[in-house]
Amino acid sequence: MDGIKYEVFTEKSIRLLENNQYTSNVESGSTRTEIKHWVELFFGVKVIAMNSHRLPGKGIRMGPIMGHTMHYRRMIITLQPGYSILTLIQKRT
């Protein structure tokens, strides 16, 4: 799926699953409306709210030159009650 890179599983994101909120990293150039459309179309759910913040890239030294990795955007997607994204809450082995 274009735009969504991968799901995030941190302590906070696991806690947010109880409130029907899912966390994922997306491409930094994607807009909220694009991500909302992709999630509703791909997973067949109804999105009621989206929060996002941009995370900074990490610094990388290449000899005397200091570079950095690309920054990315993290989205917290809230679904309507009764909807869930089953592929994200299954236990991975």
From Swiss-Prot:
Q: Does the keyword Ribonucleoprotein apply?
A: yes
The protein's GO terms of the molecular function aspect are: rRNA binding; structural constituent of ribosome
PROSITE patterns linked = RIBOSOMAL_L23
Record localization: Plastid, Chloroplast
Q: How does it assemble?
A: Part of the 50S ribosomal subunit.
Provide the function of this protein.
Binds to 23S rRNA.
Protein name, entry field: Large ribosomal subunit protein uL23cz/uL23cy
Protein's organism: Liriodendron tulipifera (Tuliptree)
Gene designation per UniProt: rpl23-A
